UniProtKB/Swiss-Prot annotation:
SMART domains according to UniProt: PTX
Protein name, per record: Neuronal pentraxin receptor
PANTHER family in UniProt: NEURONAL PENTRAXIN RECEPTOR (PTHR19277:SF94), PENTRAXIN (PTHR19277)
Membrane spanning residue stretches: 3-23
Main function: May be involved in mediating uptake of synaptic material during synapse remodeling or in mediating the synaptic clustering of AMPA glutamate receptors at a subset of excitatory synapses.
A Pfam family hit: Pentaxin
Region (Disordered): 42-81, 162-183
Topology with respect to the bilayer: Single-pass type II membrane protein
The gene coding this protein: NPTXR
Ranges per topology, Extracellular: 24-500
Organism listed in the record: Homo sapiens (Human)
UniProt-annotated binding residues for Ca(2+) 2: 425, 427, 437
Subunit structure: Heteropentamer with NPTX1 and/or NPTX2. Also binds taipoxin-associated calcium-binding protein 49 (TCBP49/RCN2). Interacts with KLHL2.
Gene Ontology molecular function, alphabetical: metal ion binding
Length: 500
């Protein structure tokens, strides 16, 4: 901007000089000369001017008072002092010519004063010089106008840039180097404008990337000043709402997964029940009469012969399990008459005699030794009663109480939906049998109640005077299935025991 100001001042000065020179080159109108006191030189000049021809008079006036007095007087002419002539008109001409090498000097002008062709050449030179000055003035005027247009354009652009600055930059503290108090080319202001323009460009690019294509096609363009704040606030609100919805959906998904798992388990249980009923319908009535008149026989010790109870057990806080057993082991332990496992606990309920150890009752992996003996290879009635309150237990053999105790898995309820296996001990849910812990012999009348039977009830079952079926699991042909070579055969325990 300093350069533009200097250029404008120089142009104005050049224009004024050219106008002055053009005005000075125009001949002035003739006016009568005024008599100057004591002006002998003026009188001589006037007489010389009157006596000389027109062209010569003009040249004399060109040279001025300090020049030649004119041509000598003719012979016989009266003296100037004796007969003074009346004062004639005086002519003056002021010329402004450039001091160029082509311009004739004063001596050359004096030599060519009396020659008409020399004066004509001088006039032509002066006219060409005046025309050059006029063209120069016109060029300067056009350049000044162009500079003014440029200044207006730059001022307009600067105003638009100021209007596009952020509000914080528009009103932050005193402003320096403005139109009124300083140059516009200060480095600080230029850097500030560049930063503002760069910030605006970045925000515009970011908005173009974030706006969806459908909004760009359908929505009307909003003002640039209103887009960033309103759009960013709406985007922040939408982001918060979406995050809350995502978290809610995640919680619902977890809850649905848990509920679906429970529902799947319930459906599987119902399917098991339905399969049992279908199997009952397919098989028709029981092959044994009465339905509990059968036994399960496991002839040899192995890990693949067993019987499985089809009915699932509920949650139990007390139980009594009674059965008829005849062991055919050779003195190396009676094995496992029955085992009940649930998910996460393979030894929920186990009746086991391993090796030369006494018979044991395991509940939730807690052990109690039972004073029972089955080594005579005969039929024996065994009953085990337990309650979760204080972990009380009782063991009966052939209707008589053999032992009792407490603190066996106290306050632990028997978990439901497990698998009940006859003849094998389970290391996992429903499998991984160990041949050394298998039962060898016959099992009959396995019944299960959800409470502890009284000693009188146990005695009535053992001597066949008051037979009683389990209310949780009765001994029925349709509920017991043999696998791996174990066999089911008709057997009336009271008659068979009498015969044995």
């Amino acid at each position: 901007m300093k350069f533009l100001a200097v250029l404008l001042a120089a142009g104005m000065l050049a224009f004024l000089g050219a106008v002055i020179c053009i005005i000075a080159s125009v001949p002035l109108a003739a006016s009568p000369a005024r008599a100057l006191p004591g002006g002998a030189d003026n009188a001589s000049v006037a007489s010389g001017a009157a006596a000389s021809p027109g062209p010569q008079r003009s040249l004399s006036a060109l040279h001025g008072a300090g020049g030649s007095a004119g041509p000598p007087a003719l012979p016989g002419a009266p003296a100037a002092s004796a007969h003074p002539l009346p004062p004639g008109p005086l002519f003056s001409r002021f010329l402004c010519t450039p001091l160029a090498a082509a311009c004739p000097s004063g001596a050359q002008q004096g030599d060519a004063a009396g020659a008409a062709p020399g004066e004509r050449e001088e006039l032509l030179l002066l006219q060409s010089t005046a025309e050059q000055l006029r063209q120069t003035a016109l060029q300067q005027e056009a350049r000044i106008r162009a500079d003014q247009d440029t200044i207006r354009e730059l001022t307009g652009k600067l105003g638009r840039c100021e209007s596009g600055l952020p509000r914080g930059l528009q009103g932050a503290g005193p402003r320096r180097d403005t139109m009124a108090d300083g140059p516009w080319d200060s480095p600080a202001l230029i850097l500030e404008l560049e930063d503002a323009v760069r910030a605006l460009r970045d925000r515009i690019d970011r908005l173009e990337q974030e706006l969806p294509a459908r909004v760009n096609l359908s929505a009307a363009p909003a003002p640039v000043s209103a887009v960033p704040t309103g759009l960013h606030s709406k985007m922040d609100q939408l982001e918060g709402q979406l995050l809350a919805q995502v978290l809610a959906l995640e919680k619902e998904r977890v809850a649905l997964s848990h509920s679906s798992r429970r529902q799947r388990q319930e459906v599987e249980k119902e399917l098991d029940v339905l399969q049992g009923r279908v199997a009952e319908l397919e098989h028709g009535s029981s092959a044994y009469s009465p339905p509990d008149a059968f036994k399960i026989s496991i002839p040899i010790r192995n890990n693949y012969m067993y019987a499985r109870v089809r009915k699932a057990l509920p949650e139990l806080y007390a139980f009594t399990a009674c059965m008829w057993l005849r062991s055919r082991s050779s003195g190396t332990g009676q094995g496992t008459p029955f085992s009940y496992s649930v998910p996460g606990q393979a030894n929920e309920i186990v009746l086991l005699e391993a090796g030369h150890e006494p018979m044991e009752l395991l509940i939730n992996d807690k052990v109690a030794q039972l004073p029972l003996s089955l080594k005579d290879n005969g039929w024996h009635h065994i009953c085990i009663a337990w309650t979760t309150r204080d972990g009380l237990w009782s063991a009966y053999q052939d209707g008589e109480l053999q032992g009792s105790g407490e603190n066996l898995a106290a306050w632990h309820p028997i978990k439901p939906h497990g698998i009940l296996i006859l003849g094998q001990e389970q290391d996992t849910l429903g499998g991984r049998f160990d041949a050394t812990q298998a039962f060898v012999g016959d099992i009959a009348q396995f019944n299960l109640w959800d409470h502890a039977l009284t000693p009188a009830q146990v005695l009535g079952i053992a001597n066949c005077t008051a037979p009683l079926l389990g209310n949780v699991l009765p001994w029925e042909d349709k509920l017991v299935e043999a696998f791996g070579g174990a066999t089911k055969a008709a057997f009336d325990v009271c008659k068979g025991r009498a015969k044995a």
